[in-house]
Amino acid sequence: MGVRFIRGLQGHDENYLKAAACAKHFAVHSGPEGIRHSFDAVVSRQDLRETYLPAFKACVQEGKVEAVMGAYNRTNGIPCCGHQELLQDILRKEWGFEGHVVSDCWAIKDFHEGHGVTKTPVE
């Protein structure tokens, strides 16, 4: 369903997009909404690959989605918006994504305030 939605939004012209679709919230957007800025979704490798990633992979490879938005939460201890394995290794290298990646509102601020993975706000 996501692939068809993306194709409808972006159109079929190879020279330009009608609109830029954005697949979100990459990749393990789970857990209580009230603690989404500090939640750590702990998932097995198998669950990640079989449950959470297939829809995003289809959006990237079949739908040619132009943008991907990272989730607020952490996945296995690492904030999704700064997750090397998810954003670089899987999304870019394995799937060949060439579009742009965006963070959700305040997700970068959450590295320090919500997740506590930095010592200072600047870091």
Regions found by a protein language model. Give the residues of each.
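Glycoside hydrolase catalytic-domain context in secreted enzymes
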Residues: M1-E123
